Amino acid sequence: MDETKKGFMQNIGDLSFKKIDETNYEFSIKVEEKFLNTGKIAHGGFIATIADTGMGNAAHIAGGNKRAVTINLDIKFISAGKLNDILTGRVEILKKTKTLVFINCKILNSKGIVATASGTWKILI
């Protein structure tokens, strides 16, 4: 467990995140055994968590490094992430207002799209 992270995020492991430009961000993580469901594929809750985390980080930065909380999150599971896959999230800020950020995300592995996500974050002022 990563003791430098707080709370629930200690369970996620090494999720890397980078800003590409003002509206595009990217994150990645390796699928470990602890992230698998009983069918031996990446658990849907894990996919939702990394989408929420990656998109939330983008909202935080887009909002001027202010705290941002998820208002809604919609996930569509398209294919399976498997053990040792590197999942990459491509995040796009669609619109930002003073207090809201609207975001889309595609999560991919080496074979294509694993999931898509869209959501809205509230910037806490």
Q: Predicted segments — roles?
A:
Residues 1-125:
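Terminal targeting signals and extreme-terminal segments of soluble enzymes
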